[in-house]
Amino acid sequence: MDKDSQGLLDSSLMASGTASRSEDEESLAGQKRASSQALGTIPKRRSSSRFIKRKKFDDELVESSLAKSSTRVKGAGGVESGRCSGSEPSSSEKKKVSKAPSTPVPPSPAPTPGLTKRVKKSKQPLQVTKDLGRWKPADDLLLINAVLQTNDLTSVHLGVKFSCRFTLREVQERWYALLYDPVISKLACQAMRQLHPEAIAAIQSKALFSKAEEQLLSKVGSSSQPTLETFQDLLHTHPDAFYLARTAKALQAHWQLMKQYYLLEDQTVQPLPKGDQVLNFSDAEDLIDDSKLKDMRDEVLEHELTVADRRQKREIRQLEQELHKWQVLVDSITGMGSPDFDNQTLAVLRGRMVRYLMRSREITLGRATKDNQIDVDLSLEGPAWKISRKQGVIKLKNNGDFFIANEGRRPIYIDGRPVLCGSKWRLSNNSVVEIASLRFVFLINQDLIALIRAEAAKITPQ
């Protein structure tokens, strides 16, 4: 009886112990859930901060970058999607999490390394090709030679004339890119190697003078008259100091420039007086009083100018009225007066020596021979060996217009216009006819031609 009662007591104690343990575990699990809900995140597994370097393959690189970017994206509830897909934490991890402080820590947004790598890779080609269009190979060669000569980028910016107007910052950036950027320096070297040797020689001739070169040139006296041989001897004496592309002529030109600016050793610059103030153009322009520049009206002067203008116009009018009277006197002395046309003369071809009268409606021009008789023998005026036997024909039409037709080899010039063989041209009063260096003036009897036109007008309606 005692044994049975003792066994029942033991079994009841064990059952109560197991029940109490299950209740303790449930209460502990409830506390853990409450703490995790208060934090808003599932506790992370503690891992070592030591990084183990391991070679990654291409597929791993792509998948890891995608996995990292996906694990950084959080849902609206604040739970990471990568963590939700994993396995549940063990009991030992739960115990460690329960000991952690309950204060929530706000997560700090950190950029993903995969995205930053892609941004850097996309920016690099833009920086490489940024200045490839503006900086020519000739500019790079000029920049390199000038920096090697002066070792001063400010002097290079002021003294070198590039193909574009670069700022000092752009010159500095280009020089640093040529030094430290392997991509840009490689492209620039390839472009410079493709330059023509003549272009390279022209660029090298524009290299700036170094301080050592100018110091040697300054020793040549300003009072002396150095020749090209003097500078050639200077080149042979100091071959290491001068640039390889220097010539005696280039040294002479630079020496003359230094002499002009008083940079030689035996030249002294006169100091300015201390009391005097040097004004530039803008300062002098500001000192000018604009009110004094206005023209002051002088009534007496204006009256005199008006009277003089009226007097000159009266004299000009009188001379114009007397012009035809003086023309008659001049023509009577020189014998070049206008001819007196008779009733039978239609026109006159007047030369320097002879006058040819046109009394028929059609006349021929040329050079007369024994076998060829023509109306107007041009050999009477001057040398006519270049004129054809039958050079041309002048005709009068019913409407009163004169036309000349060229039938010779050489052209006939009417007022400077050539009339070729087989062509014709209208002659007007005072037209200049030039045939093989012989010049004539064609004069028309206007009165007789007017009568002919009137008769033609009467006949036309009938």
UniProtKB/Swiss-Prot annotation:
Which taxonomic lineage does the organism of this UniProt entry have? Eukaryota, Metazoa, Chordata, Craniata, Vertebrata
Motif Nuclear localization signal residues? Answer: 113-123
The question of whether Hydrolase is a record keyword is answered with no
Name the record gives this protein: Microspherule protein 1
List every position bearing N-acetylmethionine: 1
Would you tell me the Gene Ontology cellular component terms?
cytoplasm; dendrite; histone acetyltransferase complex; Ino80 complex; MLL1 complex; NSL complex; nuclear body; nucleolus
Q: What is known of its domains?
A: The N-terminal region is required for nuclear localization while the C-terminal region encompassing the FHA domain is required for centrosomal localization.
State the encoding gene: Mcrs1
Q: Which UniProt keywords apply?
A: Acetylation, Centromere, Chromatin regulator, Chromosome, Coiled coil, Cytoplasm, Cytoskeleton, DNA damage, DNA recombination, DNA repair, Kinetochore, Lysosome, Nucleus, Phosphoprotein, Transcription, Transcription regulation, Ubl conjugation
> Which segments show compositional bias classed as Basic residues?
43-55
Q: Assign the protein's first listed, main location to one coarse class.
A: nucleus
User: Which residues carry the post-translational modification Phosphothreonine, per the record?
Assistant: 103
Q: Compositional bias of type Low complexity: which residue ranges?
A: 81-90
> What's any GO biological process attached to this entry?
regulation of DNA strand elongation
**Sites bearing N6-acetyllysine, chain numbering:** 123, 130
List the source organism.
Answer: Mus musculus
